[in-house]
Regions:
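Juxtamembrane intracellular "pre-TM" segments in multi-pass secondary transporters
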Residues: 5-39
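Extracytoplasmic gate region of multi-pass secondary transporters
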Residues: 32-86
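Helix-to-loop junctions at the C-terminal end of transmembrane segments
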Residues: 85-98
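A late C-terminal transmembrane helix in Major Facilitator Superfamily
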Residues: 152-197
Length: 217
């Protein structure tokens, strides 16, 4: 009987402890986390950049003198460069505590790619700019997905961060192609849209540096 009473008392104390700890965990709101917002902004801007590239890259290249067939092949080359980079970056990101260097590589590839499209229009150089855009897009997309796990402590937090970042991020990204199409119509060239994309890529870099810190939401 004494052993049974001790076991019952111990079980009761454990239950009390669990009941105290559980509400404390529920009080944390992911919407109040600056780190969560940095992940969300990074997610949204990298998606916006990708959607704009897929939507308008052929038109940009055609206006620079390529045929529609050549422009289509350039878009295919970009995606061929993007796909293996996603897997490569995922492996690297999972083995480092901070992803600062990966964020910088991805964003700088995109910025250099846009600068190249803006300033140098030869066929061979354009292939280089397109490959850089693909590599950069692979890095940024992979990191935006990895941050859901890397910046959280458990599956529940990861699910909440993913829901926040993807709902707001894709909503933000959806306006990108329309906005840059409007800029083109207003200026009748792709100079201002490309300059704006360089600016967006710079903001994406800054938010990525914040999101890549070895912290949790």
């Amino acid at each position: 009987m004494a052993v049974d009473n001790m076991a019952a008392d111990t079980l009761e104390e454990v239950n009390k402890t669990n009941n105290i700890d559980e509400p404390t965990m529920k009080e944390v709101s992911i919407w109040k986390s600056s780190l969560a917002w940095q992940v969300t902004i990074y997610m949204g801007l990298q998606s916006m950049i990708f959607y704009c590239i897929v939507t308008w890259l052929p038109s940009i290249l055609i206006q620079q003198g390529m045929t529609s067939s050549q422009a289509g092949w350039m878009l295919s080359i970009m995606q061929l460069a993007l796909i293996p980079t996603i897997f490569f970056c995922s492996i690297l990101a999972g083995h480092t505590s901070s992803q600062h260097s990966l964020v910088m590589v991805g964003s700088l590839c995109i910025i250099i790619g846009f600068l190249g499209l803006l300033l140098v229009h030869s066929f061979k150089s354009t292939i280089l700019w397109i490959i850089l855009l693909g590599i950069g897009g692979g890095f940024t997309f992979s990191l935006s997905m990895m941050f859901f796990n890397l910046r959280t402590n458990n599956a529940n937090e990861a699910a909440r961060l993913s829901g926040m970042a993807q709902s707001i991020g894709y909503l933000l990204a959806a306006f990108g192609p329309m906005f840059f199409g409007y800029l083109h119509d207003a200026t009748n060239n792709w100079t201002m849209p490309l300059i704006t994309l360089i600016g967006v890529s710079s903001v994406c870099l800054l938010s990525g540096l914040g999101a890549s810190r070895n912290l949790s939401v």
